[in-house]
Every structure is written in C-alpha cells, then in structure tokens.
C-alpha cells in the first residue's frame, strides 16, 4: 500500500542520510491524497496519487487542481515527469528542487518507495535571486515509479504504460542517473529511454500534420568533476542516437533524427551527503532553469535562452480539462488500445464544450427565463406588456454567453469548438426569437391602442367646442412619435449578423394600423404641456426658494451666504423676495406655456384655462416648498446656523476664539435674541414693503367661464380664492401656528444653550492647564515613593492591576456611571448619617435638653428611610417624588 512504512520498525534513516525536513517516521507519500481515499485539505496541500500501483486512475485529480488554483490557469501551467531506476533518489531530487514532500527511501531497508504515479505542485516559486530567474507559475511535478525494481521483477508492463502516459502529458522528462552509470545500458536507463522513444513513435510520428517535441532533461547525480559534463553529455547523446537508429520507424521517416523530436538538456549535481551545502546551492541554481524560455544558439546557455519551458513543448490542453484528458489517455493505455492523441483531444473538446455550454447557459437562463415567464403570464392574462430594456438585456446576455463560451472553449479542438459554438448560438437564438416576437406584438398592440385613444379624444373635443385645429399636424406628429417609439424598440432588438432580427415587415404593418386611427390629440397634448411646465416651475422654485431660505439671517459664511462675503438682503424682506421670485418664475412659465400652446393651434379659452391652472398649481408648489423649508428639522437647523453665524463670528466674519475675559454671556444673549426675532417673521407670509398679505386672489384671477369640471378635479382649494371652502386668506398665509412657534422657540433655546455651554468650556479649558515644571517637581519629590512601589512586588502588582482596571473602565466608557454611582452613594451616606445623628440627639436626654427638643415616639425608631435621589445624586424634590410614585 502507498501508506505503508518504509521500514518495518517505523524508524527514520540516520540524521546524516535523511532529508532535513523529513518526518520522524518515513512513509511512502502517506500524507498525500491516495487513490480510493477521501482526501483531506492537509493531504491536498502535499499532493495526490494520480495512478496507483494497481493502474487505477484517481477521480479526484480535478479537485486537486482546483484546490491548488491551477485549474483556472488556462495554458499557464507546466508538467514535469521524472524517470529513473528505483532507489536512485528521484523523489529526493524533486523534494529539494521543487519543495515537494514525496516519500524517500530508507537506507535501513532498501526497497521501493514510490508506487504508481504521484503529483505535487511546485512550492519553490521564488528560487531565483531576481525576478528574471523566478521559477514559472503552476509547475506540476509527477514522480513516476522507478524502473528495474525487484517488486515488479521482469514485469515491464507498468513501466511502458507509465512512460507512455508521461510522454503524452508532460513537457519535460527528467532522467535521474548517477555519474558512474553513464556509459552503461541498464544502469543509465537506456532501456527506459528506448521505451520512451518507442512510445514517441507510437504517439506522434503517426500524426504527419504536426511534430510535437519533448525535452529530455538529464540530471547527473554525484558528479565529482573528474569527467567534464561535456564529455558525459557526448556519451549520452551517442547512446541515445544509437537507440533511435535501431528503432523501427513508420514509412517515410526511416531517416529521421532524434533531434527532430527531442531536445536535450543536462545538469550535474554534487554528492548530496559528502557535499551537502554545495548540493543545495546547485539545486537552487538548477531550479532557476524551470521557467519560460526559447531556443538559443549560444553554447553557454545549453541551447536555451531564459528557461527550459519552450512553447512547442506544451501539449495545449487547458488546465481545467487536463484531468479529463489524462483519464482518457490512461484508459486507452490500460486497455492496450492504440493511443490516438488527436482523437483524445477531440473527445476532450466535445466533453468540455458540452460542459462549458451547460455552465454558460445557466447564467443565460438566469437573465432570460424571468422575462420569458413574465411575457407568458402577460399573454395568458390578455394584457401583453412591453418589457423594459429587453433588447439590451437579450443582446448583452447573448454576447456575454457566447463570449464566456469562447473564452473557455476556444482553447480546445478548433473544429469541435466551432461546431459546439454554432449549436449554442442556435439554442440561444431560438429562445430570443420567440421572446422578441412577443415583445413586438406587445409593442404593436399597446402603441396602436395609445395612438387610437389619443387621436379619438382630440377629434371629439374639437367637434364639441367648434375650435379650429390642424388635425393633420396633430396626427402626423403623434404618428411620428409612435413610429419612432416602435422603431426604437425594434432597433433595440436588432443583433448584427442575424437576419431574423430585421423587423421591417412588422414595422410596415404597424404603420398601416396607425394610418387608420383618428382622435382628440390636442387636449392630451395641452395637458402634457401643462405637466411639463408645472414640473419646470417646481424645479425652479425648489432651487430659488431654497436659496432664499438658506440666506436666512446668514450674515457671513453661512450656508446661503455668497462666497464673496457680502451680506444678503435684509431678513425682514424675506417674503418680499420669495414673492417676487415666485411671480417672476410663474410669469416666465406662462410665456413658455403660451408660446407652446399656440404652436398646437390652441384656442384662447384653452390657453386661459391652462394659465389659470398653471397659477393655482404653482401656488401649491410654492406652499409645499415653504412647508418643507419650515419643517421642524429644517427650520431649526437654519435658526441654529443663523445663531452660530452671529455667536461664533465677529462683525468682520473672523471666527471667535473664546477666552475667559470675553463677554460670552453678552454676545450669546445678543445673538440668541436676534435669531428669536426670525420666528415671528417666519410664522406668516406677509410682505414687509406693504405690511400686508399678498393679493393672491387678484393674482390668480377668477375662474374662466370655459373651464371644464374635469380641469378642477386635481386642484387643491386655496384660502381666500375658493371662498366656498371656508378658508380665509389669513389662514392660507399662516406658515407656523402658534403652538409650533412656541415649540420652535423652546427647541431653539435648548440648541443655543448647548452652543453656549460648549463656548464656556472651551474658554475655561484654555487656562486649566498644569504648568510643565510641576511634573518635574512631582517627579523629584516623589522619587523615593516611586522606587519603593517599583521594588515592592505587592505594590507593583497592585499598581499594574489598578492600571488594567482603569484601562478596561476607560475602554468600556464606565467612568461616567462609576462616578455617578459614587456621588449618589456618598450623598445617600451623608443623608443617612444626618438622620442617625438626629435620632440619637432626640433619643438622648442630654441631647434633648441641649437642643430643647421634644421626645419622640420610640415606636418609629426601628426603620431607616432612604431618600429618592435624582440622576446627580441630589435629593429629589417633593414634586419629583410624587411624579415618580404616579
């Protein structure tokens, strides 16, 4: 089993021989996620067994890739496999080189450690001293079971299958050999390399369309330096060439060279035990070669510029599909079928494209399905409605869905990807076509109904009043608007490249239906015009009236004061300014309304009614804005700003810095009284120039004779104008009732008092400072006591506990409650003491004689009464006690 101990005693190798970070009891990758296990997070952090010794593939490989954040890296990953004879230190090399934790062999019991194929992610991401020498991202390392082991004996079936699997998936094949094995056949793994060459012919030479390459990276261990690396390299190349020449190759490739399909790299490492420091240094240098690079002609770079990961080595399998691809390859290998990698890639592409298609359609369904359900429900109810932003939603959903599919699936087989994309687009377009057709039907019905009603009403009104109007202009204009609306909706549904989104025939049918409709359009247009003008008046009044109220009493940089510092107009003429602004705004609105109404060829009566309604509506807007400004919170804030401008700043607009010598009380009283005079001013809408109420009835005018009762339904009664409502002009112009005025005065005074108290505190705080020399004097006089406390453990610990208690109390904001409790307790204690003393004097004969007091009834001396205290610890008054009892 993969989790068995390396030796029967469960003991480690000697301290000299073992890897410094190895566990005390060495196991064969016991902490990895093995085949058949329920993997844990800790196991995934170390690695995973891809294939066990029974040739079973691990179905959790994709989960491991997701756990290591490799599955989403696309093509930005690299796969390395290591080959070599059993017990030659392959796992040890990988652990040092990539920071992995593969199980290593115990010298006490020379037996097989690695069974099957194991994988772990590189953990030495920063091997290089500089950024240019940093190892590549997402390096996956496969530790392949060693060859020539006594456990399998002459059974080379797994050896051949594992070599075939590694070659089909890996970019770099590391061959781990010892220096003294160079020149041997079995010792130098030439038998294994012959197997690699044979499976390479089986895999790639049959595919004449491409020439995949792989890198054979020879790591020569225990290199003493007596034989130069170049000589060892030449020997290995000669042996490899001889093996390649002896292979039986496909027709037409008999004269091919080994260099056409393989690149070679070489590295030498010193003895791990005899030269441990140098071994670690050379391994770190070797790690810097595992990064992206390209071919180089310079000999000193060993044929590579930058690193050994060349683009042509990559198998071009996206990381999220690697587990499926690897499992398919292994199934083919185990079943002893001819491994056809192009077919495997197509199968992988079909599987992944279908899977990706289902995933992206989930997002598409989330956006489109609610719209489909709404449209179906409206159709069943007989009231089809136009769904807002359907065109942009459909177009965006289609584009994003296809784009997401393209982003993930385009990395797979191009032919399969193109076919699956066409299928996906067909599914999307079928649903959008039905949805868009229903949208246009709803737009058609609602548009025709709206147009028909509008034109019919316009005709009836013209016939009733015998007024002249250009019906053709009205119909043409409304028709143009309706057509434009339909056209806009149709264009919003258009998708470039899709012929079925050209809705010209539906547009022609819609235009034909509009040509059959007539109605009374002008009145509707007049009402819409009135609404637009009223909205404009509301917008203008909201801004201008708000500015006037913001100027309220702000003598310098208040919220409404100009930036230049000039004082605004007097506070007394506030209502005059508001009335003038209101009249000017409405006059401008009347001009706009009249000009626009004449362009509709409206009658004088219609214009008169419209202007009459405009004035009444505008007054309602003004009253609503005034009521909003004098709401309790708003007006109180403005009064506070007015008070603070006068209290906190001098006549020149300079902020006051309070000192004890300042006449804070006088300034406060003056500012407060000045602000209080504003409240009566604000309570009634009265013009200061004439000292009278505005002539609202005269300004609005009498009700036009041609007014329609329907025109008065939405109008609010106005005091002094609509006398039948029983509300006078005086009541209409009252802004603040007497009760609100009194309440506002009380609230403002409380607010002003708070500002005053704050100013007094700031003035007192400026002088309540302890002189600095006092601290030096305190330190000098109390030095002996400080030393005594610090040297006495009891005092020192007590001091620390007091400090901790004080800090906790301060952090929890408990000082206030504690002080109030102490004050209350002390006050209560004094009262009880006085009461007991009074009882003693009354009960004592000498005390009575001295005080001339009458004896008291001893029957009432048993109880001690407790007084009711207020929040400050004072004795509460009798009235407060009675209220407390109620």
Curated annotation (Swiss-Prot):
Protein's UniProt name: Protein sey1
GO biological process: endoplasmic reticulum membrane fusion
Chain positions covered by the region annotation Disordered: 372-399, 851-886
Organism: Botryotinia fuckeliana (strain B05.10) (Noble rot fungus)
Membrane topology recorded in Swiss-Prot or TrEMBL: Multi-pass membrane protein
Sequence intervals crossing the membrane: 770-790, 794-814
One Gene Ontology MF term: GTP binding
Pfam families documented for this protein: RHD3_GTPase (PF05879), Sey1_3HB (PF20428)
Function comment: Cooperates with the reticulon proteins and tubule-shaping DP1 family proteins to generate and maintain the structure of the tubular endoplasmic reticulum network. Has GTPase activity, which is required for its function in ER organization.
Residue ranges that the Swiss-Prot or TrEMBL entry lists as coiled coil: 502-527, 722-743
Binding annotation for GTP: 84-91
EC code(s) of this entry: 3.6.5.-
Record topological domains on the Lumenal side: 791-793
Entry keyword GTP-binding: yes
Ranges of residues in domain GB1/RHD3-type G: 74-313
HAMAP family assigned to the protein according to its UniProt record, in alphabetical order: Sey1
InterPro entries: G_GB1_RHD3_dom (IPR030386), P-loop_NTPase (IPR027417), RHD3/Sey1 (IPR008803), Sey1/RHD3-like_3HB (IPR046758)
PROSITE patterns, A to Z: G_GB1_RHD3
Keywords: Coiled coil, Endoplasmic reticulum, GTP-binding, Hydrolase, Membrane, Nucleotide-binding, Transmembrane, Transmembrane helix
């Amino acid at each position: 089993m993969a989790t068995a101990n390396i030796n029967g005693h469960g003991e480690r190798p000697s301290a000299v021989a073992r890897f410094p970070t190895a566990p005390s009891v060495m196991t064969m990758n016991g902490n990895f996620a093995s085949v058949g296990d329920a993997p844990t997070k800790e196991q995934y952090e170390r690695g995973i067994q891809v294939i066990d010794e029974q040739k079973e593939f691990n179905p959790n490989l994709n989960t491991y890739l997701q756990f290591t954040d490799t599955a989403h890296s696309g093509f930005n990953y690299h796969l390395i496999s290591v080959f070599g004879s059993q017990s030659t230190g392959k796992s040890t090399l990988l652990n040092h080189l990539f920071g992995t934790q593969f199980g290593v062999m115990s010298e006490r019991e020379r037996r097989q450690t690695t069974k099957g194929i194991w994988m772990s992610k590189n953990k030495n991401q920063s091997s290089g001293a500089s950024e240019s020498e940093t190892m590549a991202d997402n390096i996956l390392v496969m530790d392949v079971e060693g060859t020539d082991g006594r456990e399998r004996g002459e059974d080379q079936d797994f050896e051949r299958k594992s070599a075939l699997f590694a070659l089909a998936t890996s970019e770099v094949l590391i061959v781990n050999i010892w220096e003294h094995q160079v020149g041997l056949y079995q010792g130098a793994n030439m038998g294994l390399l012959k197997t690699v060459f044979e499976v390479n012919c089986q895999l790639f030479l049959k595919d004449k369309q491409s020439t995949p390459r792989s890198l054979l990276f020879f790591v020569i261990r225990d290199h003493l330096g007596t034989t130069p690396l170049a000589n060892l390299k030449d020997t290995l190349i000669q042996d490899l060439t001889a093996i390649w020449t002896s292979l039986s190759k496909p027709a037409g490739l008999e004269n091919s060279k080994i260099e056409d399909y393989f690149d070679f790299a070489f590295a030498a490492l010193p003895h791990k035990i005899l030269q441990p420091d140098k071994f670690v240094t050379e391994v770190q240098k070797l790690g810097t070669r595992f990064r992206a690079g390209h071919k180089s002609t310079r000999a000193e770079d060993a044929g590579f510029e930058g690193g050994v990961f060349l683009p042509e080595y990559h198998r071009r399998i996206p990381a999220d599909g690697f587990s499926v691809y690897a499992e398919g390859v292994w199934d083919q290998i185990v079943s002893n079928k001819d491994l056809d990698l192009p077919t495997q890639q197509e199968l992988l592409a079909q599987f992944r494209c279908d899977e990706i298609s289902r995933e992206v359609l989930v997002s598409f369904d989330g956006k489109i399905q609610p719209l489909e359900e709404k449209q179906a429900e409206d159709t069943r109810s007989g009231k089809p409605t136009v769904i807002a932003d359907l065109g942009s939603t459909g177009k965006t959903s289609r584009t994003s869905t296809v784009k997401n599919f393209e982003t993930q699936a385009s990395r797979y087989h191009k032919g399969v990807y193109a076919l699956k994309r066409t299928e996906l687009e067909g599914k999307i377009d079928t649903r959008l076509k039905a949805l868009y057709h229903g949208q246009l039907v709803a737009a058609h019905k609602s548009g025709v109904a709206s147009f028909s009603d509008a034109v019919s009403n316009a005709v009836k009104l013209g016939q009733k009043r015998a007024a002249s109007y250009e019906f053709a202009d009205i119909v043409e204009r409304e028709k143009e608007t309706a057509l434009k609306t339909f056209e806009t909706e149709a264009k919003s549904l258009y998708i470039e490249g899709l012929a079925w989104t050209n809705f010209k025939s539906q547009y022609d049918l819609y235009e034909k239906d509009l040509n059959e409709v007539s109605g009374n359009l002008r009145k509707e247009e007049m009402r819409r015009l009135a609404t637009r003008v009223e909205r404009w008046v509301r917008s203008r009044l909201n801004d201008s009236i708000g500015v006037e109220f913001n100027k309220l009493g702000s003598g310098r940089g208040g919220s409404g004061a100009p930036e230049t510092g000039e004082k605004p107009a007097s506070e007394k003429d506030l209502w005059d300014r508001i009335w003038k602004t209101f009249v000017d705004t409405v006059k401008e609105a009347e001009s706009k309304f009249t000009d626009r109404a004449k362009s509709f060829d409206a009658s004088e009566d219609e214009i008169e009614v419209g202007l009459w309604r405009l004035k009444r509506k505008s007054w309602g807007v003004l009253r609503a804005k005034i009521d909003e400004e004098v709401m309790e919170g708003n007006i109180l804030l403005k009064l506070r700003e007015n008070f603070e401008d006068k209290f906190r700043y001098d006549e020149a607009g300079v902020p006051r810095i309070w000192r004890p010598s300042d006449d804070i009380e006088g300034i406060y009283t003056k500012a407060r009284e000045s602000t209080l005079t504003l409240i009566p001013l604000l309570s009634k809408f009265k013009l200061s120039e004439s000292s009278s109420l505005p002539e609202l009835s005269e300004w609005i005018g009498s009700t036009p004779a041609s007014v329609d009762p329907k025109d008065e339904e939405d109008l609010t009664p106005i005091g002094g104008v609509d006398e039948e409502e029983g509300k006078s002009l005086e009541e209409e112009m009252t802004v603040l009732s007497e009760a609100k005025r009194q309440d506002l005065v009380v609230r403002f005074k409380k607010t002003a008092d708070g500002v005053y108290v704050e100013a007094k505190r700031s003035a007192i705080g400026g002088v309540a400072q302890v002189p600095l020399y006092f601290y030096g004097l305190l330190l000098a006089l109390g030095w002996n006591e400080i030393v005594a406390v610090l040297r006495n453990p009891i005092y020192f610990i007590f001091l620390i506990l007091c400090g901790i208690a004080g800090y906790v109390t301060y952090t929890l904001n408990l000082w206030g409650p504690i002080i109030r409790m102490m004050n209350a307790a002390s006050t209560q204690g004094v009262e009880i003491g006085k009461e007991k003393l009074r009882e003693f004097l009354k009960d004592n004969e000498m005390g009575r004689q001295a005080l001339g007091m009458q004896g008291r009834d001893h029957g009432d001396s048993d109880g001690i009464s407790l007084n009711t205290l207020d929040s400050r610890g004072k004795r509460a008054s009798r009235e407060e006690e009675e209220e407390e009892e109620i």
